[in-house]
């Protein structure tokens, strides 16, 4: 979202970026935007105490608390700004923001930060409920979803489709979002046409205006070509760049990079299975394991995720072939010549960063659209392997050996080809470049109509 905001500023649009107090305090480079005279930050309370971890498994608590705490402040910002707001670009999950925009008469564009294929899975839920197919039993997860040409099984739908109760608050939130999305004047996606053309065509049945402007991290660099570099990072975690020195000493394409993103949380058993699999694979590995990424039975200063007893074989295997850091400069790591694959949680940003870097993937999804993304990586785009619903050291080791060894050339060739299309899309004349120009003109038209 922050990269999209910077691109809008570059195009001469006046931007107010609204964030939570908690996230804004942790942005490392927010002062960078002072170079844009028409860019400003506003912050909202999220209603949670400072010590709340705000991890992906607690997203419903965050959304509910934020709606209650921030809606009045948001309404005030939207209705009383000077100059007045003439367009709201909102993340799709904040349906209450869309309601406020409608109340004050501000045109709405949705920017869904999940993948279009993931959003399409989300939008299928009301129909599955209406047809009586939802909820699913565990025995039915391998049944093919109708209308997907055999690509999607029920287990490949967004994670909330595993919930057994139609009245669960998460299911009701998804239904509410699905009902709100067609009310927007357009949908903005962080993707490119060559990657998801069939899905984007389907989206036109929901919204008359579709803007595929990604991959945003590469698109922003294209727009800034010849100018100052973009914001160093929009991550809320401090990057440990010592891993780059370690990578510099490794052979070409010999390292698999491992990260489960900024929100996912694994159990200690899962930690050990992944770790054993990496060591047993015989491959070199760089693992970015952020603080708080491992759940503990009794959280507290005396029981944190660093309190992990490391067996001798893991310690020796890591010392010989591995490097562990708290958080890595991911774009730089994926672009490094020593890296030859990515074991990822399949978050959409990470997936796109891997696509642009031409890195094959091993997908171990956790939440939301990640189940869909991992299926598309293996079954549709042929860019790697899908490890969903499995966390076994033998499977991990086998998949690492495939991606880094026996099928290395196959995956690398396909990934390199897709990377070329991604980069073409964000350069002048490319599909994403043209879609963004169209977005700017449409936003300016909204401004004219609102006067």
Which residues fall in each region the model found?
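Glycosyltransferase specificity loop/lid
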Residues: 1-451
């Amino acid at each position: 979202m922050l990269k999209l905001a910077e691109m809008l500023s570059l195009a001469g649009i006046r931007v107010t970026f609204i964030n939570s107090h908690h996230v804004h305090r942790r942005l490392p480079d927010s002062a960078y935007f002072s170079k844009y005279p028409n860019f400003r930050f506003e912050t909202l309370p999220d209603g949670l105490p400072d010590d709340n971890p705000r991890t992906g498994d607690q997203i419903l608590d965050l959304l509910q608390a934020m709606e209650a705490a921030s809606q009045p402040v948001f309404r005030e910002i939207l209705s009383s700004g000077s100059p007045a707001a003439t367009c709201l670009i909102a993340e799709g999950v904040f349906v209450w923001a869309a309601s406020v925009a409608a109340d004050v008469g501000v045109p709405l564009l949705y920017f869904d930060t999940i993948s279009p294929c993931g959003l399409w899975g989300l939008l299928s839920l009301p129909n599955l409920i209406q047809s009586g197919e939802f909820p699913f039993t565990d025995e039915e997860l391998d049944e093919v979803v109708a209308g997907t040409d055999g690509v999607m099984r029920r287990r490949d739908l967004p994670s909330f489709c595993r919930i057994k109760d139609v009245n669960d608050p998460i299911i009701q939130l998804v239904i509410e979002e699905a009902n709100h999305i067609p009310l927007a004047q357009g949908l903005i996606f962080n993707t490119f046409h060559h990657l998801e053309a069939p899905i984007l065509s389907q989206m036109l049945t929901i919204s008359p205006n579709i803007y595929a402007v990604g991959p945003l991290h590469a698109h922003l660099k294209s727009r800034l070509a010849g100018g100052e570099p973009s914001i160093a990072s929009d991550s809320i975690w401090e990057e440990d760049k010592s891993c780059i020195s370690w990578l510099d000493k490794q052979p070409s394409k010999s390292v698999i990079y491992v990260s489960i993103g900024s929100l996912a949380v694994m159990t200690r058993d899962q930690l050990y299975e992944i770790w054993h699999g990496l060591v047993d694979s015989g491959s070199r590995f760089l693992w970015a394991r952020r603080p708080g990424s491992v759940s503990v039975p009794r959280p507290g200063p005396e029981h944190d995720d660093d309190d992990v007893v490391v067996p001798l074989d893991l310690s020796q295997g890591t010392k010989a072939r591995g490097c562990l850091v708290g958080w890595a400069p991911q774009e730089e790591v994926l672009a490094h010549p020593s890296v030859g694959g990515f074991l990822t949680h399949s978050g959409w940003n990470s997936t796109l960063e891997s696509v642009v870097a031409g890195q094959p993937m091993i997908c171990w999804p956790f939440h939301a659209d990640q189940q869909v993304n991992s299926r598309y990586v293996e079954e549709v785009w042929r860019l790697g392997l899908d490890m969903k619903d499995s966390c076994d050291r033998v499977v991990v080791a086998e998949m690492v050996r495939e991606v880094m060894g026996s099928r290395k050339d196959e995956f690398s060739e396909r990934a390199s080809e897709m990377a070329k299309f991604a980069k073409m899309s964000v350069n002048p004349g490319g599909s994403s470049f043209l879609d963004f120009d169209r977005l700017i003109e449409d936003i300016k038209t909204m401004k004219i109509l609102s006067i």
